[in-house]
Amino acid sequence: MLFRSLEPARDQYDFRPVVDDIATLAAHGKRLFMQVQDVTFSENLPVPDYLMSDAFGGGAERKWESGASGVQFDGWMARRWDAQVRGRFTRLLDTLGNVVAARIAGINLPETATAFDNGKAPPRGYSPDAYAEGIKLLMSAARRAFPNAVVIQYANFMPGDDPPSTPFLRAIYAHAAA
């Protein structure tokens, strides 16, 4: 589920689709494993409109990928490295956890891979270090919000790593194992 779908306006949450899915699965002896998305791979914004303000640094950033056909728009990503934006995502996780944590099997946080390869300066406040720290803080927040559920961070690539040297990705794995 997209962040913006679960919190359509500031502090106004809509967990009905999640609760409905839980009920449907429970009727069949199953439990929900869900993903809360703060990233898209399209023009659709992942964050609530109120986050797209200056107070939140714009809330989300355009992602860019370099490929054989040049630099192309690749969707949007919440500013995970920004404490204000991360705080709102953490609040969403806490509130969602209060409602459904005991009734779900697990929660998955979206992939860590991102790129801002558009030939311009990176977004304000962004650095590989700040991004990695933001990912770790979100992982910890999810664990607190869903203490009895499996929490998975989809860690597939970290900006700033230059394979085979992957210190940022290894730091994410170490945090997950702690």
Can you name each region flagged by the protein language model?
Residues D161-A178:
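Glycine-rich, flexible loop motifs
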Residues R16-V18, A23, V39-T95:
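Active-site-adjacent "subsite" loops/lids of carbohydrate-active enzymes
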Residues I104-F116, D129, E133-T166:
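Aromatic-lined carbohydrate-recognition surfaces of secreted/lumenal glycan-active proteins
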Residues S5-E7, T40-V47, T114-N118, G160-D162:
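Short catalytic/ligand-binding loop motif for oxyanion handling, primarily in non-cytosolic enzymes
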Residues S5-P8, G75-V85, F116-A130:
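Surface-exposed cleft-lining segments at the edges of enzyme active sites
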Residues A27-K30, P147-A149:
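A short helix->loop->beta-strand "cap" motif at the edges of active sites that frequently abuts
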Residues L25, L96, A142:
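Conserved, mostly hydrophobic/aromatic
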